[in-house]
A protein has these predicted regions:
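N-terminal segment immediately downstream of the Sec signal-peptide cleavage site
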Residues: 31-90, 196-200
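N-terminal secretory signal peptides that target proteins for export/translocation
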Residues: 1-11
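Beta-strand signatures of extracellular beta-sandwich domains
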Residues: 126-130
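Bacterial N-terminal signal peptides
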Residues: 14-25
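Short amphipathic, basic-aromatic surface patches that mediate peripheral association
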Residues: 108-118
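Helix-rich interaction surfaces within compact, conserved domain-sized segments
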Residues: 33, 38, 136-200
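Short coil-to-beta strand junction motifs in C2/discoidin
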Residues: 117-125
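Contiguous beta-strand segments within globular domains
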Residues: 96-105
Length: 200
């Protein structure tokens, strides 16, 4: 059968349209896979103690008598111990994709007390996402080696969470943690992200 120029043109147009539709479908699937599913905007630095009971004693060696807490409640978040000193953070912006990719940008994560207050002191940090509100908790974390905090506390993380978080993260909690392992308290947390349920 002899093919006319018009027939060839029609076949060519159909092929182009079919190819465009296929590419659009692939791009749409990829976009859904890469789409932002969880967003955190803003952060709160750790205060190591969340409650305490004051007794009638005084601080040992203090020049002025001061009450001391004989019983304190550590600020443990979903099984993760707090740092031993106060930390503050100016800003935090984090996005978690459906495929487990996470980007975190933090500003001013520095010590809020002690002899190194007002700066970071050589710590490295990583991010942990926890999706369960009650035990047992599963920690999905970036590389445990972490990224180095400069003196001003600004940092960026661009990594893959391992293990991957569940498809539905019922109660998202993002912790920024110390990469150095304490033999007693493990990888303590320095800051927590503020969850934005509307991805705003």
């Amino acid at each position: 059968m002899k093919m006319t120029h018009r027939g060839c043109a029609r076949i060519g147009v159909r092929a182009v349209v079919a190819g465009a539709l296929l590419m659009s479908a692939v791009a749409s699937a990829a976009a859904q896979n890469e789409g932002t599913t969880i967003r955190f905007k803003g952060g709160i630095g750790v205060i190591p103690v969340s409650a305490g009971v004051v007794d009638n004693g005084t601080a040992t060696g203090a020049t002025t008598a001061a009450p001391v807490a004989s019983d304190v409640t550590r600020n443990i978040v979903r099984g993760v111990q707090p740092a031993g000193q106060i930390w503050v953070i100016d800003d935090l912006d984090a996005k978690v994709r459906a495929n487990g990719r996470i980007t975190v940008e933090g500003k001013g994560l520095i010590l809020g007390g002690g002899n190194n207050a007002g700066r970071a002191a050589g710590q490295s940090v990583f991010a942990t996402l926890i999706c369960q509100a009650t035990p047992p908790f599963t920690e999905s974390s970036t590389n445990l080696a972490g990224v180095l905090l400069p003196t001003n506390g600004d940092f960026k993380i661009d990594d893959q969470l391992q293990p991957p978080p569940p498809a539905i993260c019922a109660s998202p909690m993002l912790l920024i943690r110390n990469a150095a392992v304490n033999p007693v308290t493990g990888n303590v947390w320095f800051a927590v992200g503020i969850f934005r349920p509307d991805n705003d």
